[in-house]
C-alpha cells in the first residue's frame, strides 16, 4: 500500500507528454462490468486454480461465486472483504470514478454488510492522461465513499495501457445476518431493485449515439448506492441476495439457483427496464458481453420461442453497478419493496419466484 498522490506524481514525472483531453473509452476494449471474463471461461480458469486454505472462520469463500468473502471475527462481527475494478464505461473521468466506486461497494451491501473502509486500485496510461484527468477519477471515487460514510485509506497504482479504477472494500456484518447467494428457499419471490439496460446504454454511448438524457439516466442508476442492502439484511424473511452486474440478470440468478440447489422462473413482463435502453435494444444495440453471457449459460435457460430478441439482450445485458436481487419469503415481499422504494429505488419490482428443481434437470432458469 502506498500514498496514492505521491506515486501517481512520480509516474507522471517520468512519462512522455500526454494527449490533450482524450476520451477514456478510446483506451478500453470493453467497459465497466462488460469487461469481465466470460462466465464459462472464468469457470474453466478457476477450476485449474488450487483451493488453498479454508480456515473455519471463513464463512463465505469461492464455493458459490458469492459477491464477497466473509470472515468471522467473533460472535457478533464478521469481516466482509471484496474488490472490484474495471475499465471506463464513460468518458468523463469524475463520472468514471463515481461509477466504479459505487459498483465496488455494492458487493458489501449485497452481503447485508456495512462498509467501513476502502482502498483505491488505480491503473492509468500515464503517457496519455494528464494528472488533472487522473485526479478527477480519484475525486469521483472519493465522493462516493464520502456519501457511503467511509474513508479511502490508501491503495495501489500502476502504469498500464488501459485506464483501470476500482476499490478494495471492507465491511462488517453480524455473522447471523450474512446474506449469501446460496440460501434461497423454494417458494421465495424475487425482487429486483434497479432496472436493466445499463450495458445497452453504454454500447450506444460508445457508438456516439446516446443523447444527454440517456446519459443522465445511465448515470443516475450507476451512481445510486445499494445502501438499502444494510436494511434488507436485517429482515428475517430475506434469505439470499446478490447484485446484478457483468453476467446479467440471467447469469447472477443462475448463481443463486445453483448455490441453493433450486430453479427459478422470471416473468418478462414484470422486469423493470430503462426506457431508453429498450429503444436501443429494439434497434439491435448490444454489448459483446451480452452474447458471451448467453453462450456461457444459455443451455441452462428455458427461453420462450415467441419472445423477441431484444428482451433476451436485456436479460443477459451486463449491468455496471446494477441493482440488488433479493430472494425472500412471499410474506416479506411487501416490506422488501417498501424498503427499496423508500430508499429511492422507484422501479423495484417482484420479478419471479424460486422453485424446486424438476427431476434430473438440475438448476434451471425459465422466462415466461
Task: Annotate the PLM regions.
Residues 4-368:
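Helix-biased detector of long, well-ordered alpha-helical tracts
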Amino acid at each position: 500500500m502506498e500514498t496514492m498522490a505521491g506515486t501517481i506524481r512520480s509516474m507522471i514525472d517520468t512519462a512522455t507528454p500526454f494527449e490533450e483531453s482524450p476520451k477514456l473509452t478510446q483506451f478500453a476494449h470493453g467497459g465497466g462490468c462488460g469487461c469481465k471474463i466470460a462466465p464459462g471461461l472464468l469457470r474453466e480458469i478457476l477450476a485449474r486454480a488450487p483451493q488453498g486454505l479454508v480456515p473455519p472462520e471463513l464463512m463465505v469463500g469461492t464455493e458459490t461465486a458469492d459477491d464477497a468473502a466473509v470472515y468471522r471475527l467473533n460472535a457478533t462481527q464478521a469481516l466482509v472483504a471484496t474488490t472490484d475494478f474495471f475499465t471506463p464505461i464513460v468518458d468523463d473521468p469524475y463520472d468514471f470514478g463515481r461509477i466504479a466506486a459505487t459498483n465496488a461497494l455494492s458487493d458489501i451491501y449485497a452481503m447485508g454488510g456495512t462498509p467501513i473502509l476502502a482502498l483505491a486500485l488505480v491503473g492509468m496510461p500515464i503517457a496519455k492522461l494528464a494528472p488533472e484527468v487522473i485526479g478527477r477519477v480519484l475525486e469521483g471515487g472519493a465522493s462516493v465513499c464520502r456519501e457511503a460514510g467511509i474513508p479511502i485509506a490508501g491503495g495501489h497504482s500502476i502504469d498500464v495501457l488501459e485506464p483501470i479504477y476500482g476499490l478494495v472494500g471492507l465491511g462488517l456484518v453480524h455473522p447471523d445476518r450474512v446474506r449469501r447467494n446460496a440460501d434461497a428457499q423454494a417458494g421465495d419471490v424475487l425482487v429486483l431493485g434497479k432496472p436493466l439496460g445499463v450495458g445497452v446504454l453504454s454500447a450506444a454511448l460508445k457508438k456516439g449515439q446516446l443523447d444527454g438524457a440517456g446519459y443522465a439516466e445511465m448515470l443516475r442508476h450507476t451512481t445510486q448506492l445499494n445502501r438499502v442492502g444494510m436494511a434488507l439484511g436485517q429482515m428475517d424473511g430475506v434469505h439470499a441476495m446478490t447484485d446484478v452486474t457483468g453476467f446479467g440478470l440471467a447469469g447472477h440468478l443462475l448463481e443463486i439457483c445453483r448455490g441453493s440447489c433450486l430453479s427459478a422462473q422470471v416473468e418478462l413482463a414484470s422486469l423493470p427496464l430503462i426506457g431508453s435502453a429498450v429503444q436501443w435494444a429494439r434497434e439491435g444495440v448490444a454489448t459483446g458481453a451480452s452474447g458471451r453471457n448467453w453462450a456461457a449459460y444459455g443451455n441452462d435457460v428455458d427461453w420462450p420461442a415467441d419472445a423477441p430478441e431484444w428482451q433476451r439482450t436485456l436479460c443477459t445485458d451486463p449491468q455496471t453497478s446494477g441493482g440488488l436481487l433479493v430472494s425472500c419469503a412471499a410474506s416479506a415481499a411487501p416490506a422488501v419493496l417498501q424498503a427499496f422504494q423508500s430508499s429511492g429505488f422507484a422501479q423495484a419490482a417482484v420479478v419471479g419466484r424460486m422453485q424446486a428443481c424438476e427431476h434430473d434437470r438440475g438448476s434451471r432458469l425459465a422466462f415466461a
